[in-house]
């Protein structure tokens, strides 16, 4: 039996988007969301996901991971990832 994982804060939104109405996959989904959050925040240079565009990318990457297609996420969302990365880079540059 696997250990219980703290439900990710985007779990309900992800389940609604994916039309998942049971709780049997909650641990696995929370782990996918956690790894997606880590990957996206690292890629775009953000510290949190208050920006709705960042949350959207986290949900989309988790969707690709859920469907075992995560390798296609980066190609399909390259423009969004680059735009946010550059925006965050400029914001950090202004504070120096």
Residue ranges, per PLM feature:
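Mid-chain, structured segments of secreted extracytoplasmic proteins
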Residues: 59, 63-67
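C-terminal structural segments of small proteins and small subunits
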Residues: 66-87
